[in-house]
Each structure stands twice: as C-alpha cells, then as structure tokens.
Amino acid sequence: MKIYSYNELKTRFAEYAKPGEFSITSADTFRIIRLHYDEKQGCLFAFCNTNIEKRVLQFYFKVKLNLYSYKQCYDKHIFPSCRNKCISYTTFVAPGVEGNCLNKINVIKYERNKAAPSDNAACLDKFLHNVNRVHMQTPFVEGAYMRFKKTQRCQNNYVGGSTTRMFNLQHFYEDFELVDEMTLTSGIMPVLSCYDIETHSDGHNMSKASVDCIMSIGFVVYKNDEYARFCFMYHKLPTEIPETHDDDTHVVMFQNEVDMITAFFDMIKITNPDVILDFNGDVFDLPYILGRLNKTKMLLKRYDLPAAAPTTKLFINKLGNKVDTYYFNYYIHIDLYKFFSSDSNQHKVENFQLNTISSYYLGENKIDLPWTEMVKMYNTRRLDVIAKYNVQDCMLPIKLFVKLKMADSVYSQCILHRLCTDDVICNISHLISVACFYAAITNTRINESTGKEEPDPYFFNKNDLSIISGQFNADKATAGISNLKRKLTPLKNIPKDAINLGPANQTVKYKGGKVLQPRASIYKNAFSLDFNSLYLTIMIAICACLSNLVLCEDGNVYLNHNSRAIVVKLLLKLLSERCKFKKNRDNQSESAFLYDLYDQKQNSVKRTANSIYGYYGIFYKVLANYITRVGRNQLRRAISLIEGLSNDPEILKKFNLNSIGFKVVYGDTDSTFVLPTFNYNEIFDETDTLKQICTHVETRVNSSFTDGYKMAFENLMKVLIILKKKKYCYLNSENKIVYKGWLVKKDMPVFMRIAFRTAVEQILRHLDINKCLQSLQASFYEYYDEFAKSKPMTDYSFSMTYNDNPGKKRKSADDNNEGPSPKRRVITVARHCREILVNKGTDFVPGNGDRIPYLLIDIEGKVTEKAYPLRLFDPVKMRISWIKHMGILCTFMNELLEIFGDEQKDNLAKCFTAIMQKYMQNQLYDRKEPVLVKINQKKCSVKRKRDDDDDNNDDDDDDGCDSSDSENDTQCANNTYKFCLYKIKK
C-alpha cells in the first residue's frame, strides 16, 4: 500500500492509457468495444481496442451518419401521395390473410438528429436504444472484429480517417473490412474496472446520503492481465496511513469529500476503462454519490470528448419493482448484482450477495470486516484496513466478469440479435421484441416469377402487444385482441388449414404442459425418453407467429398456416445457426478462444429460441395455450407408442427375450420415464443391453412421428426415486446422482439439504433404508453439536426473498358491494428481518428480489416474530429455536413414509424421535415431539389451507403443471400414517 498526493498519482498514471502516436495497419485487427451515437452532431463514436505487441491499445473514431426512427402517419391520405412521404407497412400483429385486404400501418421514417425531442420520445421504436438502431441500419456492431483498409495514424487515442474526409457510412467498404472470427487465434478484450464506496453512519442507523459522508471509494482497473488498485479516502482530520510493501494499492487522502469524488471521476478518464462494473450500484452507490455531490453534476469524461452526465432508464425487475438503471454514454456500465439477479441461468447460487456468488464461482470471499467495526476504525482514523476491504470488493466483480466470460456473452447477443451493451440486464421479452422488430422490417419473400428474394417488410408495433396482452384493460385476461383496430376477414376467406383459436374476446386462463401423477416409489433400471425441443418443434409445425393471426367476422381468431411467417423463419434460422455454432465449437481442438466464442453463440441462440414460447405466454396467452395443448397431445401419443411396444416381436427377437413390458411411470411436459420389465437372467451385460433396448425404443417411436417431432434417449437410471409431480432423483448409469425439484429449495438450510441428500444417497446406491436413517441421524447430531463452533452459521439459516409488494389482491364475492377496504400491511419474514437490519444500521440492506438469510430465536410468538437476520445473530447472547428446522425434517420423514410405506413407519419413528429429542433438549418455547397419526382419507384431496406462520411462499411444487388434465391423476398412496408435531406436555 503506497500513499500519494493526487497530483503525484496523476503524474504516475499519465501515460497509462495514452500510448502516444502509433499506426494501425491494414493487417491489424481491432474490435468495436462500445458505440455511442450523438443525436445533436449526427455522429457515431466507435470506441475500439486492438492488440499490438501483446498490449491493449485503445482508440476511437467518428463516423458521420444519420440515424432513423419511425412514427405513425395520421394524414387522411385523400391524395395519391402523402405529404409526409409515409410508407404503408403490413402490421406484424394480426395482419389478416394475404390477398384479402391486409391490415396496414402508415409509417414515416425520419432522421432522429433533425427531429424534435418530443418526436423521438414518442416514436414507434422508442423501446430501442440508439445503438440498437446502429446495429440494424449500419454494419457497425459492438463486439465485431474489423480492420482498416488503409494504414491509420492514431494521435491522442483518435483515428481521424483520411486528410480529405472523415469516416462516413457511404464509404464504409472503402475504409473498413469486417473480419471473420474463424480467422482469429485470440480475442480482444475490453479494459475492465470496478468501483465500490464505503459510507459512514452513526452506528445505529443505515447510511443516509443527506447526512453521512463517503469514507472511501475503491477503484480497480484490469488491463493486460494486470490490476491497478486505487483507494480514495476522505477524512476531515489530517490522517496518516502506514505504507506496506506487500500490497500495491495506491491510496490518496482527501480532506474534502467532493474533491475525493471528483478525483475518482477524473481517474476514470485517466485510466480509460471500457467497462465500469459495480455491485448494486444502481440502487446504492450511484444514488449515494449523487446525493453527496448535492447540486454538483456528475460528469464523466473520455478522451477529448465533451463531459457527459449519466442517463437513467426505468428497469422493472422480475418481481415487478421499479429501479433506475444508469447508462454512462462513453463507457459500458454493468451493475453485476442486477445482472445476476435478473439472469434465469444463475438459479444455482443461494442468494445474490457478492460473497455468496464469489464463493460459488471463484472460491474466494470478501474480507470479513463487520460494518460497525469499520465505522469504529474510521472514527479512530485506522484507515488501512478499510482500504484493503474496499479494494477487495472491487476485485471480485472483475474476477467474476472474466471467469464467466461475460464479455463474449454480451457481444454474442449484439452480433446475433441486434442487442447492445446497454441491454445486458434487460429481460428476455426485450430481446425477442428487438429480434422481431428487425426480422419484420427486413422480411423478404421469394418472387414466384423470378425466383429471387424481394423485400416484404412488416412493421412491429409494440403498442399492439400491449393491447392484445390486455395491459390497457382493467381486466387483463379479457378482450385483448378484440380491441385491435383491424378489418375483419370474411369467414369464406379463411384458409381451410387455419386453426381456430376461439373467440377474440375470450377469457384466458393459462394451461401448462401435461404432468402425470406418479406413484411414490423406487424404480430400478428405468430410462427417460425426452422430446427434442418440443415447443420449438410445435411452433414451427403449426406456424405460430403473431403475423399469422387473423381476426374473422365470425368473432373468432384463426392461426393461418403460413410457413413463411416472420417468427417461423426466425426459429428455423436460429436452429440452423445453433447447429452450425455447435459444429464449429466441437471442431476447435486447438483454439480455446474459438471454442469459447462458438459456445457463447450457440448458448445465446438457444436462449433466444427457447424464449419465444414464453414471449407468447406474456403477450398472447391464447396462442401459448394452443402450443401447450398440442404438446399435451404429443406426450399422450408418445406414451401410447412406448407402451404399445410391450412384447413387440421385433424387440423380443433382437434381444432374445421371452417377454418385455414398457410402462410409463411418470411424464412431464416433454419427457417420459419408462420402466422396462423382463427377466434379467435372459440378458448378458445388463447395462449395455438396457442401453441398446432404450436406443431401439427411441428409433421405433421416432419412426411413427411426423412434422419434425423427435424423442431422444436421455438417461438410463439405475435407481429412480419418484416422490410426486416434479419431485424426483436418480442414480444414472455414470454413477452420478441428479435431483429435480426435490431437496433443492433455497429456503431450506444448507446443512439439512446436505443431510437429506446424504441419506437419500444411501438408498440410491445401496437400496438400504437402515443406512439411510443412520446417516440422517449422524448428520443431524453432528450439526447440532457443532452449531456456532466449527460449522458456518450460514449452513443453518433459512432465507426468504424480500419483495416490497408481497401477495396478490384477493376479492370475495361480497367485495363488489362494498367500498374499498383499507390496505393491510403484510408483514412477511423477509420484511420483518429487513426492518431489523434497517433499524440496526447494517452495511447491507437487502433490496427487492434479495434473499434474506435468517434464523429463529427461542422466544414466545409466531414464526415471523421469532425470525432474526443471520447477519445480526449472536450465538453467545441469543438462543436458536429449532422448531422450523424440525418442521422441515417432519416433511422429509413423511416423504420417506410415502416412498417406503407403512411397513417402515416404526424405523422412521425411532430415528425421528431421537433427532427431535436432541434438538429440543435446551429449547424453552415450542417444544414438540413427533407422533404417528392415521391419515383421514376423506381429506386427502383437500388442498391444505395456508398456515399463517408459513411465511415463505417460495414453493416450487407443481408450478405450471396441467392440474386439470385428470388422466392418471389419482395418487396411489403407499402409507396410511403420517408424522405430525405435537407440543410436549409439561
């Protein structure tokens, strides 16, 4: 750790991002890292990186171009030509039948840089960023590799083109060459940075920007595989920090807080990162910095360009809560917390705190420095430890960004789908909207007379989606598409192969995929046959596209069978691209760079294709329902075909068997679990022969399908345990154990998950209930004895997602006759714990979507009242309550009872009682014991009323399953008893 004055630091890093004059030849490849369009100048700024002599060199160039947007023309068009020079496009949503008065929208294409701000704010493509438009209208794309056609001279990081003219779009192919990635041997990465602030407080309440200062700003830059570490610290009193030789952090002390913040902004310009990362910066760091600046504007500079203030855009997270997102114009800004919490692929981590994510992906943790201790250190001017803590918090996000190859992931979306780097945290529906907009406006058709492709543009009007989804209606489920202003098509003009989707004004209730009700049991040597991309295949087969919807005079909506529809062509293109990318990826035996590149691209294409069904579920549930209906029929047909192969002569002859039966013991949406029954003494190599039988069944079933439907043999399950719908686990032929829906819930303490899985493993590997119960008891005893000792406290905690707006509005039949009732404030466990954290003034206050870890303390009251945040739990001063842990154990013991039946009830009761006695021995309140009770069969089918104390609504049971499809829906129970917890009588 070295201490500098700020002027010394500026001098030391003056040349860090200024390589002086250098040449970029026609052989030097560069990558567009960031694009920024200035509407006032009508100019595109391209920020680029190139690798020369194993160093990253940064530069930018300008391109003169006009960017276009679209607005609706409201002229009455009484004359042959429109004074606004509008173009008539076919509507993307419900255009009608080709050749029978297609519905049109008149659109004016105009130059954004010459338009009034009000026009740009109200344009039809307002959901796009300017860089999305650049990607659609020019060859410049973020993440693309390029070369200059002629050698260019770079001065002060600027490449100006020739002496006679600046770069412009009309001369693109004279000035630039697009580079095929297949010809590259290594990638060009952006320069990364991350910042983090530490704030002061009175030690009792959370920091407030109006009162509490910023103690320090950590800032780390990652360039050329090296880190440059900075810490800007503020203290109103003169303070000395001891220097150390084992840490190369550059520390600068300030006695004026605004000077410190300004110096931080200045250091961003000096070090010139391409990407600025933070963690929860949109919610905490940036608003706090702005609050401390008071009336001073936050301005970011880059090169010799005019300083620009960040812009904000409202972001709605998956819980429906609204948060501002900050964009940095010349820089890429990514709030990694928002990225992880909004990415559906990150469901494996326990929560989205930096420590948890870093531990999971990097095996590294933050420095353990309690916030109250940090404030004490600051007050006594011991700032060196705070600096180390602050800088470490900046290192971890950069390491995560590199480890997860996030740059290639982001750029793949830009190149493939016309997204931009500012779309990195946008939801999947935005991705599909951008892809559909571009596909519609550039749509082509084959001219039957010439055989050539010619333009056939449609216009994607996002306002139509709001109408058909019912967004503008009080009752969102009804009359959506009937509110579209469309000419109705006569019934006689509806094609005969069109599908009737029902009345346009129908009430829509979503119905998911088919799920069979299984019998809880253990199965040996079952195998799974799954459909390959079932919903994608259905959408292509039925031509599911919003441009195929037809509103008919008979009041119904029809789905036209037009295979040239925009989304159908998009799906076929995506599937083709994925096959190509996977093939290219698998051919990369020598280049790790190309392998990763193609892997990111195939993942991006897969994610987009798989999201289109969900897109219909958001905006037009009628079409989504029809897709799932076809899926249910295909699953029924598959089950019939599989079971119809029982005692098939060809199979008997091929495998020398006297008899064989196939029974589908479970099915879910697109998969089947099949149990083959035959005399195993008739086969030689059990595993190999079973795999051959599975492959043969796959071939026979697929030979009966048409329209591209295919099933694939996925797993041979040596032992399969099915508990209920969507809850099972198995040991596959590679000796790997897989859990699906069972023992995976995040609200269950880690130690219980470990104990349960270890116990279940004894069944899967040894088929031994006694080993299972011995393992379970030993694990629970160990974790009880080591509580607050060798085992981390996080292993014992529960967690619940915090949401500002919990629950749904429920109305009774009598509510219509009464006035509005006062809104009742719902106190969930998460809200209760958050309020405690706020009142205690902790360093991290969870926001919407955060999972809050908590324990129960042994006091009198309901679960909510007992809940206490783990961050503040002190095992020396507080006594834990185990009652919720034992409730989860009770559920698990009942699950084992369902699987094994009544004959094992005594063994289960003995184990359960021993564990309960251990955990209840020092507890004062809610002391309970397990009791076996007879199940009242009449009440088996009655849905359990929600317990007031059951505040965790994170159940993942039966989500989206087709509960109304009663085929094979009667559960056959193995047990007539169940465990209940009763209070111990004093």
From Swiss-Prot:
Enzyme kind, highest EC tier: transferase
InterPro entries: DNA-dir_DNA_pol_B, DNA-dir_DNA_pol_B_CS, DNA-dir_DNA_pol_B_exonuc, DNA-dir_DNA_pol_B_multi_dom, DNA/RNA_pol_sf, DNA_pol_B_thumb, DNA_pol_palm_dom_sf, DNA_pol_type-B
Entry's EC annotation: 2.7.7.7
Protein name listed in UniProt: DNA polymerase
Gene: POL
Source organism (scientific name): Bombyx mori nuclear polyhedrosis virus
Domain of life (superkingdom): Viruses
Chain's role: Replicates the viral genome, host DNA polymerases cannot substitute for the viral enzyme in this process.
Comp. bias (Acidic residues): 948-968
Pfam assignment, any one: DNA_pol_B
Record field: catalytic activity: DNA(n) + a 2'-deoxyribonucleoside 5'-triphosphate = DNA(n+1) + diphosphate
Molecular function via GO: DNA binding; DNA-directed DNA polymerase activity; nucleotide binding
Region (Disordered): 804-824, 944-969
Keywords per UniProt: DNA replication, DNA-binding, DNA-directed DNA polymerase, Early protein, Nucleotidyltransferase, Transferase, Viral DNA replication
Record-annotated membrane-spanning stretches: none
The keyword DNA-binding appears for this protein: yes
Sections of the chain in a coiled coil: none
Phylogenetic classification of the source organism: Viruses, Viruses incertae sedis, Naldaviricetes, Lefavirales, Baculoviridae
Biological processes, Gene Ontology terms: DNA-templated DNA replication; viral DNA genome replication; viral genome replication
The family this protein is said to belong to: Belongs to the DNA polymerase type-B family.
SMART domains in alphabetical order: POLBc
